[in-house]
Amino acid sequence: MILDADYITEDGKPIIRIFKKENGEFKVEYDRNFRPYIYALLKDDSQIDEVKKITAERHGKIVRIVDVEKVKKKFLGRPIEVWKLYFEHPQDVPAIRDKIREHPAVVDIFEYDIPFAKRYLIDKGLIPMEGDEELKLLAFDIETLYHEGEEFAKGPIIMISYADEEGAKVITWKKVDLPYVEVVSSEREMIKRFLKVIREKDPDVIITYNGDSFDLPYLVKRAEKLGIKLPLGRDGSEPKMQRLGDMTAVEIKGRIHFDLYHVIRRTINLPTYTLEAVYEAIFGKPKEKVYAHEIAEAWETGKGLERVAKYSMEDAKVTYELGREFFPMEAQLSRLVGQPLWDVSRSSTGNLVEWYLLRKAYERNELAPNKPDEREYERRLRESYAGGYVKEPEKGLWEGLVSLDFRSLYPSIIITHNVSPDTLNREGCREYDVAPEVKHKFCKDFPGFIPSLLKRLLDERQEIKRKMKASKDPIEKKMLDYRQRAIKILANSYYGYYGYAKARWYCKECAESVTAWGREYIEFVRKELEEKFGFKVLYIDTDGLYATIPGAKPEEIKRKALEFVEYINAKLPGLLELEYEGFYVRGFFVTKKKYALIDEEGKIITRGLEIVRRDWSEIAKETQAKVLEAILKHGNVEEAVKIVKEVTEKLSKYEIPPEKLVIYEQITRPLHEYKAIGPHVAVAKRLAARGVKVRPGMVIGYIVLRGDGPISKRAILAEEFDPRKHKYDAEYYIENQVLPAVLRILEAFGYRKGDLRWQKTKQTGLTAWLNVKKK
């Protein structure tokens, strides 16, 4: 199994290194015979001797073309003859390529920016992560006395925790009496002990959470300051910092450094990406957070170090568990695109598509188009086109809704209509598909480069799904599932890739044609559903819709929806297929991309309405949840309004317990850097004035008090709130917490802010006069 590939230089010559795991043993293979090359298209082939004379300089050494070869290739499907120019060293290419491109005899150069080791994997047909080797995984995490705003790695590392299949341990240099904690004499000894752990356990994969940006750079810096070498690599090398676009990534030679942070950011959508939030989202279990100021306080006073050590151990354990969850998926993506997992796990979906296309282009003898230069990139960024169709929703509370959507709408359109840069407006074809509205033509005489690859991916995914159904082996089933999910990620990224400004196979005409067909098909479905089957379509978003038959029973709605799916699929061309997604008992739509539904099991599904940030008080979150329940579970909007009025009444009468009023906000930088003083900053400044050490990362819980002046002056620390002495600002909580949380829902039913507040009734006019007369 190939883990990684790179090259080293000996006597001025490049040597490819392949890091492998074979029969449980780690090994390195070398290849001294692979030469770097680029392609050049000449105006006149007789000029090749002139081109061969081009030289440049690199580090005082003359760089030249060492060999040439004329080759037949294809460019966007059309035959082309180019020259393959060979060089002595990979670093010669960036030194000389501009001179070659600018030579009067040269039209253009190609494939001059593919890294040497990646070029080797492509040309030799080598696939990383292929095979059944059992890989050893180890996760680690550090706790430090670093505070944002100060010099990076100024404060010491106080704990290093690690976890693998044998469990989790913590190394520290202050006395902590716990069975999983090993105490050493100093920070220097702790780092040395960690190095020994890595040597003894010899993991193939080192898992971190944000290790690229924090743990590894911090460890490297501290080791430097303490004069310690950090040979974490299997070749005895230290971790190597690499620039990847606008981020820094850390490589450990011979081991895969798997930073989960990048993978999780790409894979799941969360309001915040702390380790605690991610763990809860994936495993449904909470994880305690110990803040930077608490860690510093425990270290300084010696009190509460057991809690910090437990937190550190859990960080490593949780990172290991998350690593085991996500690693197999990334391994499948690595196999699919044919590049090392270290790169794949740090790639955007656009880059994953590109690496896959580069490998397939080589296999098909296609010359890869060049990436855009700065000017072309800027031009592409300015281009725009119409996206998917989104219908303004029908407001109100609806019963008996069905959800219908297209299976892989955009990939299906690309394949069905052969949408590809090499088929676009191609002359001399017998048959074309013409995109609606935009009128771009796509040749149907031969399968386009990208549609043919996409079809193979979708066919493979269907085959895997069939195997999964037939398999009785749970492990085989899980591995097949990882593979089909990897294919799904790649397949669903092709449409976006066409419009990705940095793409080699960028094609704005392709992207806008795909969305134009998408709009046509969803509109066709809507028309047929309403006119032929009597449904009312309530909401459409790009590739799916919600609909109902007003007054019909649930069973009839479901039956007719299934009949419609069968009917429409017989009319749709090619791979296009509509699916019945599910039935919902009740639902309402506020605006585009904001709605809530309840299914037959009583599960509430919301989109765009959630209040999940911590700066919402418990009373706001609780009221919103009760409002949703009243509307969706009981079908009673009036009950929801009554709930809000009751809460505003209780707030007005000071009947809400203070713990439900606490608003939490985090201090994100040193206090002196804040220009706008929000309530949490004002509270933090008052704490600091009393001698409390306030550090970035600290979370302030505050309650807003009744009174005059700005809110920042009326906010106090939650723990200091005394109901006997203090009154909270009921108006603030009604206007800024509860009503905004429920208005986004109740506006859909025509309610305004004034309709939702409890009003203290006064007897006025005739009623008051009559009551007086009765007396």
UniProtKB/Swiss-Prot annotation:
Listed under catalytic activity are: DNA(n) + a 2'-deoxyribonucleoside 5'-triphosphate = DNA(n+1) + diphosphate
The EC class name is transferase
Record InterPro entries: DNA-dir_DNA_pol_B, DNA-dir_DNA_pol_B_CS, DNA-dir_DNA_pol_B_exonuc, DNA-dir_DNA_pol_B_multi_dom, DNA/RNA_pol_sf, DNA_pol_B_thumb, DNA_pol_palm_dom_sf, DNA_pol_type-B
- Coiled-coil blocks: none
Keywords for this entry?
DNA replication, DNA-binding, DNA-directed DNA polymerase, Endonuclease, Hydrolase, Nuclease, Nucleotidyltransferase, Transferase
Which GO biological process annotations does it have? Answer: DNA-templated DNA replication
Q: What is its EC number?
A: 2.7.7.7
In the record, what terms sit under GO molecular function? DNA binding; DNA-directed DNA polymerase activity; endonuclease activity; nucleotide binding
- What is the purpose of this protein? In addition to polymerase activity, this DNA polymerase exhibits 3' to 5' exonuclease activity.
The UniProt family comment states: Belongs to the DNA polymerase type-B family.
Q: How does it assemble?
A: Monomer.
Protein name per the record: DNA polymerase
Originating species: Pyrococcus glycovorans
Q: What is the lineage of its organism?
A: Archaea, Methanobacteriati, Methanobacteriota, Thermococci, Thermococcales
